[in-house]
Curated annotation (Swiss-Prot):
Protein name per UniProt: ATP synthase epsilon chain
Chief location of this protein within or outside the cell: membrane
InterPro entries the record matches: ATP_F1_dsu/esu_C_sf, ATP_synth_F1_dsu/esu, ATP_synth_F1_dsu/esu_N, ATP_synth_F1_esu_C, ATPsynth_dsu/esu_N
Keywords, alphabetical: ATP synthesis, Cell inner membrane, Cell membrane, CF(1), Hydrogen ion transport, Ion transport, Membrane, Transport
A GO-annotated cellular component: plasma membrane
HAMAP family listed in its UniProt record: ATP_synth_epsil_bac
Membrane topology field: Peripheral membrane protein
Length: 135
């Protein structure tokens, strides 16, 4: 069994986080799942949601976008489009993005190609607001 669990959160732009953690909870596309040291290996898709982890008994939160997670007994690598630490999220900006997406969606039919992009933008904004509210 592994002595420690390393978490890496990686985006196309940067390594958002890399350190030893006690546990991590990931928003998988089939629902959230928790990982502790010694976990069985798996590969999962990641959905828009809240990723949380514990370091020295303190909980940390990130708003993540879609991607993948690779889990081994010693390491969790989360590769996502975006990852924002709760403390760094501009909640007011996220609220403006939510309002903008809702207004634009109201003008379109669900069959419109732009509608799905706006729906994804709305989901990201709502997630960012929720994660920012954790602090």
């Amino acid at each position: 069994m592994a002595e420690e669990l390393i978490l890496e959160i990686v985006t196309p732009e940067k390594m958002a986080f890399s350190s030893v953690v006690e546990e991590v909870t990931i928003p998988g596309s089939e629902g959230e799942f928790g990982v502790y040291k010694g976990h069985e290996s798996l590969l999962s898709s990641v959905d828009i949601g809240e990723l949380s982890f514990t370091v020295k008994n303190k909980k940390h939160y990130y708003a993540v976008n879609t991607g993948f997670a690779e889990v081994t007994s010693e390491k969790v690598t989360v590769l996502v489009e975006t990852a924002e630490e709760a403390e760094l999220i501009d909640k007011e900006r996220a609220m403006r993005a939510q309002a903008r997406a809702e207004q634009e969606m109201a003008k379109l039919s669900k069959e419109d190609l732009e509608y799905e992009k706006l729906r994804a933008s709305l989901a990201r904004a709502i997630n960012r607001i929720g994660v920012a509210g954790r602090i």
